[in-house]
């Protein structure tokens, strides 16, 4: 049995192929999938901004916590099951790995359906809690009242793609998300401008795209999968859920923290904006735009992390620590280069970036450009924290993964958003961003260096 396990490890390219080529193979599809997934929100924001205006942009920002919370459920189950699958396959436990994948797949469908029902039942109080103003609420209700219908498919496609990548089919994973986003992009202008449906048209375009992506996920696992999976494995098992939650919790908590920050920020902007020359709606709309722009950057960094995830997990399970360390260094370097490019764009071209999302008054552009420059000041260092969270999760260090996920959003940014505006008004929200980013970066470097040092020592003593 031990010889069979060693043979399986030796045959798997995750343990033998050059790290650079492996990261390219897995990261590029993951990056494209993450970017395309982000486009579901960004494309809507662009067309809504052009067709509906500032209040439409504000409405999508108020509705955005629903998407973030749904993403949290998808990552909890998708990353949790994929991480466990990779670890068990690396250790040669194929049957156990498949059982975990089956539980993850079925619970993705169940959780998405539950979320859809909850949002539709409590739509108005949720949107008010998320920071809706009287002028913005009608648009937000129209938008999220429709997009909630597609949540089961969104959760399935977002989480299921992690399992497909773990099943060594990164290209198909990319195609699933790409197909849905392409349909969304085509239907957005048709529904918004051609049919004159406004923000409702953007919502229906999003739902149809999500349904297509979800159906492609179902087709893969019913016809094209490489992993062994029978119907009995689709019945959720408590022991599998425990393992999935353990390794998926870091990414889930990170998304929940993002949602919490978004909600607190919206309400803070609503309150302090009303006390400023900008009013409430301009800051909320601008914050939504900057949030969507940041999604593009984070999609690339998280895509690199997700592409590295199976390499980290397999080699850690196989005790090939030098490959784990090499993969981490390569990924961090790549992410930092990309982050620096985004930093330059944010600092030198804020007007052009904001202008993509529609026209507005001089006051609107003044606030948006200032917000983008200040809040995103530490972009060049922002990729290390989410990458380290994914790294610790992939090697089975769930507790450290959770800590890394919480540092920026909960430990630093959330309290700063509450405290700074008391002293600096609405500008305090902007300055909270770079201070939180710097603090999270330092903490991530400390934890990662310590873990890599432990691996190096274990390798030398082996």
Locate each region found by the language model:
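Short runs within selected transmembrane alpha-helices of multi-pass transporters and secretion channels
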Residues: 78, 147-165, 173-181, 202-215, ...
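Small-residue-rich hydrophobic transmembrane alpha-helices
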Residues: 57-117, 154-173, 266, 284-350, ...
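Hydrophobic transmembrane alpha-helices of multi-pass small-molecule transporters
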Residues: 69-72, 184-188, 214-218, 296, ...
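Transmembrane alpha-helix boundary and packing residues in multipass membrane permease domains
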Residues: 30, 34, 46, 50, ...
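Transmembrane helical elements of multi-pass membrane transporters/channels
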Residues: 25-44, 146, 157, 180, ...
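Helix-terminus/linker motif at the lipid-water interface of multi-pass membrane proteins
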Residues: 39-57, 127-134, 190-197, 259-289, ...
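N-terminal transmembrane alpha-helices
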Residues: 14-51, 65-80, 84, 109-116, ...
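Short alpha-helical transmembrane segments in multi-pass integral membrane proteins
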Residues: 1-27, 85-152, 194-249, 312-378, ...
């Amino acid at each position: 049995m031990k010889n069979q396990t060693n043979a399986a490890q030796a045959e798997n390219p995750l343990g033998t192929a050059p790290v650079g080529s492996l990261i390219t193979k897995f990261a590029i599809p993951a990056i494209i999938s993450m970017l395309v997934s982000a486009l579901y929100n960004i494309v809507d924001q662009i067309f809504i901004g052009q067709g509906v205006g500032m209040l439409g942009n504000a409405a999508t920002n108020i509705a955005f916590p629903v998407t973030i919370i749904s993403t949290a459920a998808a990552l909890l189950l998708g990353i949790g099951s994929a991480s466990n699958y990779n670890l068990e396959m690396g250790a040669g436990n194929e049957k156990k790995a498949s059982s975990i994948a089956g539980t993850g797949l079925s619970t993705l469908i169940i959780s998405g359906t539950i979320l859809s029902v909850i949002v539709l039942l409590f739509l108005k109080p949720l949107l008010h809690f998320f920071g809706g103003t009287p002028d913005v609420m009608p648009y937000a209700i129209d938008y999220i009242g429709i997009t909630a219908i597609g949540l089961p498919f969104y959760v399935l496609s977002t989480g299921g793609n992690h399992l497909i990548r773990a099943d060594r089919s990164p290209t198909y994973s990319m195609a699933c998300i790409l197909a849905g986003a392409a349909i969304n992009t085509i239907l957005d202008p048709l529904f918004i401008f051609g049919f004159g449906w406004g923000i409702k048209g953007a919502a229906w375009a999003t739902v149809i795209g999500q349904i297509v992506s979800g159906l492609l996920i179902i087709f893969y696992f019913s016809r094209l999968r490489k992993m062994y999976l029978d119907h009995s494995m689709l019945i959720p098992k408590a022991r599998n859920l425990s393992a999935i939650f353990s390794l998926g919790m870091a990414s889930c908590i990170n998304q929940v923290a993002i949602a919490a920050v978004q909600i607190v920020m919206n309400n803070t902007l609503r309150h302090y904006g009303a006390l400023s020359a900008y009013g409430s709606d301009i800051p909320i709309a601008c914050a939504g735009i900057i949030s969507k722009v940041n999604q593009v950057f984070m999609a690339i960094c998280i895509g690199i992390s997700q592409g590295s995830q199976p390499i980290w997990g397999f080699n850690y399970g196989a005790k090939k620590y030098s490959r784990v360390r090499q993969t981490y260094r390569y990924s961090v370097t790549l992410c930092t280069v990309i982050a620096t490019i985004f930093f330059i764009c944010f600092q030198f071209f804020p007007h052009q970036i904001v202008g993509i999302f529609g026209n507005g008054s001089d006051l609107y552009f003044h606030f948006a450009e200032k917000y983008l420059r200040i809040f995103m000041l530490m972009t060049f260092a922002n990729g290390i924290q989410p990458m380290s969270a994914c790294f610790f999760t992939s090697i089975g260090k769930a507790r450290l993964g959770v800590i890394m996920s919480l540092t920026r959003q909960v430990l630093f940014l959330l309290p700063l958003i509450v405290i700074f505006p008391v002293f600096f008004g609405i500008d305090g929200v902007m300055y909270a961003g770079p201070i939180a980013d710097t603090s999270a970066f330092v903490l991530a470097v400390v934890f990662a260096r310590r873990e890599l040092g432990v691996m190096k020592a274990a390798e030398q003593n082996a």
